[in-house]
């Protein structure tokens, strides 16, 4: 069985040899990172280890205490709902058979209890939490539960999905879910309230990662080829913008869209974080307008495949997930136990400046202030 690193919109799979020991802390020399995931707005992240899970806030970068959640078992999947008291986790099955890899535990840390145990016939690959739903991803099925009663709302079929790719919206006004379709390169977008499904042919090769904006209006995707990142209107499937990460194949770990809809970031195995600029009129873009006429006249390379606006170099040997912080800042969490905060020039771009670099296992635990907030 593999260990995994979970991004906020998908999963990166690690072999057991790729799990990372806790650095710079001899007292915790046996602690290993099994999974890392942002919360829904990148204001915090959760780390699954071989001894329970840890929760961290990004504003500022501090460790939060968890009252009675299990600490003697390994969790290959750990997810949090904003900075609330609600969590979901899946055991890796190595340390303790009480937490097998085919069972999801929904934990309320305020009540110090497990709200529900969701058991499946096969291994759970990923879990996603939203205000209204708990989403459980298996290799070829996705189970959507209503959060208030934890009953199955629907089951979605996909092609083989070993990375557990899935993303959901996190605003009260919409309930949208995106996941792989039935063919390589295809994405299916579900409006969970109106039972509307849209299939988008995003790439020729298989999907490597995807993300939705908080309101479900935009969808960003990258394929296993790893050269292009595409932005779609999630409602009608229109291709709105295309970015080029590079010309060589690469594994893209995850993609993030800033909350102000100005920037897109991507991390990959090449060791460079790329930030791209979204078109200012991205949501009002009409492919039938005069710009489409320009697209016909100009060579394709002048209109599409826009290069990155800002960059930051990272250790190529470490997998990172990326998210956006405050204005013009990017947050990075690595499976080596590192946290970075970087800033880019919104006018000129270029090389980013590192503002903060810490190892989160070395942080002291603070009081339990998880209830409420984002």
Swiss-Prot record:
WD repeats: from-to residues: 28-66, 72-117, 202-242, 247-286
Coiled-coil region list? none
Q: What is known of its domains?
A: The first protein part may form a beta-propeller domain involved in specific binding to phosphatidylinositol 3,5-bisphosphate (PIP2), leading to the association of the protein to the membrane.
In Pfam terms, one family for this protein is PROPPIN
Question: Looking at the UniProt record for this protein, which Gene Ontology cellular component terms does it annotate, in alphabetical order?
Answer: phagophore assembly site membrane; vacuolar membrane
Q: Where is it mainly found?
A: membrane
Places the protein is found: Preautophagosomal structure membrane; Vacuole membrane
Note the superkingdom of the native organism: Eukaryota
What does this gene product do?
Answer: The PI(3,5)P2 regulatory complex regulates both the synthesis and turnover of phosphatidylinositol 3,5-bisphosphate (PtdIns(3,5)P2). Required for autophagy.
Subunit structure as annotated in this protein's UniProt entry: Component of the PI(3,5)P2 regulatory complex at least composed of ATG18, SAC/FIG4, FAB1 and VAC14.
Per the record, the similarity remark reads:
Belongs to the WD repeat PROPPIN family.
Q: Which PANTHER family match?
A: WD-REPEAT PROTEIN INTERACTING WITH PHOSPHOINOSIDES WIPI -RELATED
Keywords, comma-separated and alphabetical: Autophagy, Membrane, Protein transport, Repeat, Transport, Vacuole, WD repeat
What membrane topology does this protein have? Peripheral membrane protein
Tell me a GO biological process for this protein.
protein transport
Q: Which protein is depicted?
A: Autophagy-related protein 18e
Xref: InterPro entries: PROPPIN, WD40/YVTN_repeat-like_dom_sf, WD40_repeat_dom_sf, WD40_rpt
């Amino acid at each position: 069985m593999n260990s995994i690193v979970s991004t906020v919109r998908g999963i990166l799979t690690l072999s057991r040899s790729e799990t990372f020991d806790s650095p710079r802390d001899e007292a915790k020399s046996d602690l290993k990172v099994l999974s890392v995931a942002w919360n829904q707005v990148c204001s915090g992240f959760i780390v699954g280890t071989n001894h329970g899970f840890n929760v961290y806030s990004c504003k500022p970068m501090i460790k939060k205490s968890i009252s009675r959640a299990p600490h003697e078992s390994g969790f290959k999947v750990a997810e949090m709902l904003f900075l609330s008291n609600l969590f979901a986790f899946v055991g890796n099955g190595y340390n303790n058979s009480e937490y097998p890899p085919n069972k999801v535990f929904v934990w309320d840390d305020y009540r110090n209890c497990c709200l529900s145990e969701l058991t499946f016939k096969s291994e759970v690959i990923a879990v996603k939490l939203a205000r209204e739903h708990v989403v459980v991803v298996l290799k070829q099925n996705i189970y959507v539960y209503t959060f208030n009663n934890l009953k199955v709302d629907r089951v979605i079929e996909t092609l083989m999905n070993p990375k557990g790719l899935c993303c959901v919206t996190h605003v009260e006004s919409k309930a949208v879910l995106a996941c792989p379709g039935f063919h390589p390169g295809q994405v299916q977008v579900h409006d969970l309230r109106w039972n509307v499904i849209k299939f988008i042919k995003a790439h020729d090769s298989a999907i490597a990662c995807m993300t939705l904006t908080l309101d479900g209006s935009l969808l960003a995707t990258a394929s296993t080829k790893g050269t292009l990142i595409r932005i779609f209107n999630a409602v009608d499937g229109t291709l709105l913008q295309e970015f080029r990460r590079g010309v060589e194949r690469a594994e893209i770990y995850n993609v993030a869209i800033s909350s102000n809809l100005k920037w897109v970031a991507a991390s990959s195995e090449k060791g460079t974080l790329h930030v791209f600029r979204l078109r200012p009129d991205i949501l009002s873009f009409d492919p039938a307008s005069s710009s489409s006429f320009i697209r016909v006249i100009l060579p394709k390379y002048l209109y599409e495949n826009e290069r990155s606006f800002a960059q930051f170099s990272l250790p190529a040997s470490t997998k990172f997930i990326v998210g956006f912080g405050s204005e013009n800042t990017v947050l990075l969490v690595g499976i080596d136990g590192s946290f970075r905060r970087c800033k880019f020039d919104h006018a000129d771009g270029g090389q980013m400046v590192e503002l903060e670099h810490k190892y989160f296992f070395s942080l002291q635990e603070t009081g339990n202030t998880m209830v409420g907030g984002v």
